[in-house]
From Swiss-Prot:
Cytoplasm recorded as keyword: no
Organism: Desulfosudis oleivorans (strain DSM 6200 / JCM 39069 / Hxd3)
Membrane topology category: Peripheral membrane protein
Positions bound to ATP: 169-176
E.C. number: 7.1.2.2
InterPro entries: ATP_synth_asu-like_sf (IPR023366), ATP_synth_asu_C (IPR000793), ATP_synth_asu_C_sf (IPR038376), ATP_synth_F1_a_nt-bd_dom (IPR033732), ATP_synth_F1_asu (IPR005294), ATPase_a/bsu_AS (IPR020003), ATPase_F1/V1/A1_a/bsu_N (IPR004100), ATPase_F1/V1/A1_a/bsu_N_sf (IPR036121)
Protein name: ATP synthase subunit alpha
Family: Belongs to the ATPase alpha/beta chains family.
Length: 505
């Protein structure tokens, strides 16, 4: 075989020309110890707090503690394959999630990865999960209503776009149900919804997803799920990830509603991570910055001014109390951060008053400015009547011989309590709510038996839609009771009342 020197030199030249000197420079560290979802890493001298680092196998970790000779890292995934001596690389990135309309209708985890089996998410934009809340000048005071579809909430403790309204109460008394109703009520509005499930059972999250799917609400909703079996670091970060998704809509002049279900479990997850990192514990063993943890999250809900597009992010955080103790550490913290609370009570729930909202303890500090005039006109009387009823009810339990005026107030109050009851997943539009409240506060129900009120209400909407459709149309358009609307509605209520009494005789 003849060796051609020219050919060989040509091949070598080609090889040299095509040689690409790829040197990958990365700052690395070594795992000193690992356990309980926390790794201690030696090295990584220039690493920054909240930076992502990469363990072997592509598992990410979040840098939380920067100490003299090591770094405390919360592992955001399965830690069983990570061992002492493993090499850890810096990524130079801060945790980000995909945002935009691509995430609507999807169930994702804290990192934004889909967990619903519907394929990858093709989002055109990602955002950091930790950003600074809008400043004072960037904001505008809350002035537009954000309807929950629940009469008790929209009349007594109204929520405005850009508000933070806490839902607080013991376990299993309908806190999530109130939040889901609020999502369903946004169906024909321009509000996008984010539901953050934090530390919940996977079956509960699947149930919520099924309910939203069934009612056609999933098309404008994203579910961010960090379930009970997920690492504590992911449960702690889930609300921030969901908030970034909601902020995309807020910053683009749109409106979003976010539900944190619930922040008690998020606080417990953060406590777990902090104690494992050996941070000094404070009251109830929570770390010293637990208040800041919640305040920096909830301050991101805001109504922006017109120059910034007038978008809004409304937050409904949920807190679970133990035996109604609202003076515990986390409940008092979140109550002080939010703009009001909806307090749910077990006694009311078991008495069949659902949603079990305690009207006396529930308050909305800024929602009044967002209430439409029509609702204000009926809710003012309603609040007064309810307060008098509660007072008289306690008094009436002792005395049987009551004068006619007191009897009348008790009768009216009992009917108003009945009106405020509402079946689950049946949110009402504003015009329907003000119609039934107008009927109640103006005495149209006083002569009806209590057990007939639910049937009366259901029939009333159908009656007005068929015979007096102009009433709903006018209320929707004018958002206030004019003399003309009042006259027409009073006439309709009189007509329907007579018709209804004949059917129940």
């Amino acid at each position: 075989m003849e060796i051609r020197a020219e050919e060989i030199s040509q091949i070598i030249k080609e090889q040299i020309r095509g040689f690409d000197k790829k040197v990958e420079l990365s700052e690395t560290g070594v795992v000193l110890s690992v356990g309980d979802g926390i790794a201690r890493v030696y090295g990584l001298e220039k690493v920054m707090t909240m930076e992502l680092v990469e363990f072997p196998g592509g598992i990410l970790g979040l840098v939380l503690n920067l100490e003299e000779d090591n770094v405390g890292v919360a592992i955001m995934g399965e830690d069983t394959n990570i061992k002492e001596g493993d090499i850890v690389k810096r990524t130079g990135r801060i945790a980000q999630v995909p945002v935009g309309e691509a995430v609507l209708g999807r169930v994702v985890d804290t990192t934004g990865a889909p967990i619903d089996g519907k394929g990858p998410i093709n989002a055109s934009e990602t955002r950091r999960i930790e950003v600074v809340a809008p400043g004072v000048i960037a904001r505008k005071s809350v002035h537009e209503p954000c309807y929950t579809g629940l009469k008790a909430v929209d009349a007594m403790t109204p929520v405005g776009r850009g508000q933070r309204e806490l839902i607080i109460g013991d376990r299993q008394i309908g806190k999530t149900a109130v939040a889901i109703d609020a999502i369903l009520a946004q169906k024909d509005t321009d509000v996008y919804c984010i539901y953050v499930a934090c530390g919940q059972k996977k079956s509960s999250v699947a149930q919520v997803a099924a309910i939203l799917e069934k009612h056609g609400a999933m098309e404008y909703t994203t579910i961010v799920a960090a379930c009970a079996s997920d690492p504590a670091s992911l449960q702690y970060l889930a609300p921030y990830a969901g908030c970034s998704m909601g902020e995309y809509f807020r910053d683009n002049g749109k409106h979003a509603l976010i539900i944190y279900d619930d922040l008690s479990k998020q606080a417990a997850a953060y406590r777990q991570v902090s104690l494992l990192l050996r941070r000094p514990p404070g009251r109830e063993a929570y770390p010293g910055d637990i208040f800041y943890n919640h305040s920096r999250l909830l301050e991101r809900a805001a109504k922006l001014n017109d120059e910034l597009g007038a978008g809004s992010l409304t937050a409904l955080p949920i807190i679970e109390t133990q035996a109604g103790d609202v003076s515990a550490f986390i409940p008092t913290n979140v109550i002080s951060i939010t703009d009001g609370q909806i307090y749910l009570e077990p006694n009311l729930f078991f008495a069949g008053i659902r949603p079990a909202i305690n009207v006396g303890l529930s308050v909305s500090r800024v929602g009044g400015a967002a209430q439409v005039k029509a609702m204000k006109q009926v809710a003012g009387t309603l609040r007064l009547d309810m307060a008098q009823f509660r007072e008289l009810e306690a008094f009436a339990a002792f005395g049987s011989d009551l004068d006619a005026a007191t009897q009348r107030q008790l009768t009216r109050g009992a009917r108003l309590v009945e009106i405020l009851k509402q079946p689950q997943y049946k949110p009402l539009s504003m015009e329907k709510q003000v119609t039934i409240l107008f009927a109640g506060t103006n005495g149209h129900l006083d002569e009806l038996p209590l057990d007939a009120i639910a049937a009366y209400e259901a029939g009333l909407y159908t009656f007005i839609e068929t015979k007096y459709p102009q009433v709903f149309a006018d209320l929707k358009e004018k958002q206030a009771f004019t003399d003309e609307i009042k006259q027409t509605l009073t006439k309709a209520l009189g007509e329907y009342g007579q018709e209804f009494k004949d059917t129940i005789k």
